[in-house]
């Protein structure tokens, strides 16, 4: 079911709700990567729903079907959009166990949400620090330097937005692109406009956290992933750095885990882990209907799409 949900500040955010035929009492929010439309995660979300989870995916402001706000920044994504969706997830499963799955940026911003501590578990896929020094010396590091200092500032100034085709994503609003580049230039990565680190609620991430990265991912190399780990000092982290063979496939990269071609055993492993961890909370959900904006759109089944 496709919905249009209100953020805390009134911004309208497009979302998709995947409802299980046989609920297991658990609900999952999916935080997407930078510039990745929620439909890209549809097959994965539907698989989790088939396993009994309520799943909510959404587009950050300025992207996909969400309200096109030109002044949107990454701070808005983490401090308003994300906690708003956690609120909606709580409305779906007020007495149930709840988790977040973060892809790339979606795992970097957990500590920006003032209600992140209301969740019971998290899974991070390819989440890393984007600071350029964490890339191996040589051509790959030079590309990151060019992205943060030249490509994003230059193209954003020229076009009024960042053409996402340069990095394989959707176009980014100018404010989002500029804040992303600011983060990438800072050794703190997630930082405010003055360059100070933003870690307002990172200590509240004090639950089981499964963190996966892949040997063939050029966008989240091992050093960059490990650099993000200190952001969550109170989490019970389970780290997995896997080769594609470990998942029964030839390639994963930065986006492949969520593609329809991913062997279902990899998705089942995530579902099994979530079930085991969330069951330990001892909470059982009674599903409730989520409230949408008056001009919400809905369809009998959520659409799914593959990005490549």
Regions found by a protein language model. Give the residues of each.
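Short beta-strand/loop motif that positions the catalytic acidic residue
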Residues: 205, 211-213
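Alpha/beta-hydrolase-fold enzymes
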Residues: 101-188
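Alpha/beta-hydrolase active-site loop
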Residues: 40, 72-92
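Short alpha-helix in the alpha/beta-hydrolase fold that links the catalytic acid
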Residues: 221-231
